[in-house]
């Protein structure tokens, strides 16, 4: 490929050659239609590695963008973590990429610790701290990618925090690596929003708006491996103000579209969801969702106290989908493979959906899914 090059090179210490393997180092990228002449930003270091770090800037890449990052997320000698991230935009930055984005994120020793802050230090795309100085929508942080997006990340795929919004119109391929202790996600929001496989800008989402979104004339292929998280950052350093909701909208509308992972909604888990934060999943035309939690469960402050006081906490007790939109006919139904021990909870079901019960603990007395408001048709298959 003929790249325009903007290379930031660091030294990779010789000691890295002793590492038994490098997370993400040998990943193969599909979606070869990614643009032929993107600008390339490449960083390789023995510690912190961030390819793009921008504050309150307006950036436009008309010919596409390719990010390559190789860093070390955790110094085992000094017991110190480092940020290893592809795109890190904050404080009202507006980033628009045309003709496609590719992010390759490798990490010799990721920060795989049971730390509620671990997911902040490793993302393909991180957008945060919108409206840091002035509470006005024009100071939101925004990332919009038109065309193919391919993210292969050690850590999160995409993360949108306070007053920050990411829209990937597609096609989209996101692959993450499961950790043993740290919780990481294909998509994660904390008082921000993310749209995957949709042209509707993420800063327009509300608790009910995605349900009435006009149907696209043609769906893009979406392939996602990793959990999604709607988290309530009401603790620790820089807690969110709680002015509005957190939303993920993901459209799987082609036969080759697939999501493997589960959905954590801390607002729904705790029973305190004033802005109806959650996940809207469109699943039709025989697209598939393999529901199973991947990797480590989340550790966070306040869970035990809330559980003791109310009987509800923040931890994952099953995938929670705010709105599930199935096919328009039985022939165009979406398909769920329920492979997790915990049940799926759907607030609102629209359209036709089939669910195949593959739970390892399945019994005839427990259902693989619970639908609170059924406005469609659900078929359960064994």
PLM feature spans:
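All-beta strand scaffolds that present successive hydrophobic residues in beta-strands
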Residues: 31-37, 58-63, 94-100, 135-137, ...
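Gram-negative bacterial Sec-dependent N-terminal signal peptides
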Residues: 1-26
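Extracellular beta-strand/loop-rich repeat segments of large surface/secreted proteins
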Residues: 225, 247, 254-382
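N-terminal intrinsically disordered, low-complexity tails enriched in polar/charged
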Residues: 4, 25-38
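Glycine-rich nucleotide cofactor-binding entry segment
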Residues: 103
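Extracellular beta-strand/beta-solenoid scaffold signature
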Residues: 25-28, 40-53, 70-90, 106-142, ...
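Catalytic-site microenvironment of enzymes
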Residues: 63-65, 109
């Amino acid at each position: 490929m003929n790249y325009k090059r903007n290379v930031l090179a660091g030294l990779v210490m010789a000691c890295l050659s002793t590492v038994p393997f490098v997370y993400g180092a040998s990943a193969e990228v599909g979606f070869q239609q990614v643009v032929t002449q993107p600008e390339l930003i490449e960083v390789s270091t023995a510690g912190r590695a961030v390819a793009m770090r921008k504050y309150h800037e307006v950036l436009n890449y008309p010919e596409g963008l390719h990010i390559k990052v190789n860093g070390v997320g955790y110094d085992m000698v000094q017991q110190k973590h480092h940020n290893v991230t592809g795109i890190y935009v904050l404080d009202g930055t507006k980033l628009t990429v045309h003709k496609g984005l590719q992010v390759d994120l490798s990490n010799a020793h990721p920060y795989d610790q049971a730390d509620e802050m671990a997911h902040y230090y490793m993302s393909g795309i991180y957008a945060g701290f919108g409206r840091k100085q002035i509470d006005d929508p024009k100071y939101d942080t925004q990332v919009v990618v038109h065309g193919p997006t391919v993210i292969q990340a050690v850590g999160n795929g995409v993360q949108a925090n306070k007053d920050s919004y990411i829209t990937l119109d597609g096609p989209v391929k996101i692959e993450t690596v499961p950790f043993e202790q740290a919780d990481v996600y294909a998509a994660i929001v904390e008082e921000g929003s993310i749209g995957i496989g949709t042209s509707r800008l993420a800063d327009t989402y509300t608790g009910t708006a995605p349900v009435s979104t006009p149907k696209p004339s043609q769906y893009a292929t979406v392939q996602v491996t990793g959990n999604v998280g709607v988290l309530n950052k009401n603790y620790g350093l820089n807690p969110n103000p709680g002015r509005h909701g957190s939303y993920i909208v993901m459209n799987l509308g082609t036969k080759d579209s697939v999501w493997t992972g589960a959905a954590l909604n801390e607002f729904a888990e705790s029973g305190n969801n004033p802005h109806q934060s959650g996940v809207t999943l469109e699943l039709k035309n025989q697209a598939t969702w393999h529901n199973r939690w991947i990797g480590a469960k989340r550790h966070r402050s306040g869970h035990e106290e809330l559980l003791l006081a109310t009987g509800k906490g923040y931890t994952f007790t099953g995938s929670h989908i705010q709105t599930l939109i199935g096919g328009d006919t039985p022939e165009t139904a979406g398909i769920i493979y329920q492979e997790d021990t915990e049940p799926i909870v759907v607030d609102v079901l629209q359209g036709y959906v089939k669910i195949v019960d593959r739970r390892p603990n399945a019994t005839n007395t427990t259902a693989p899914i619970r639908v609170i408001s059924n406005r469609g048709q659900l078929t359960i298959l064994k």
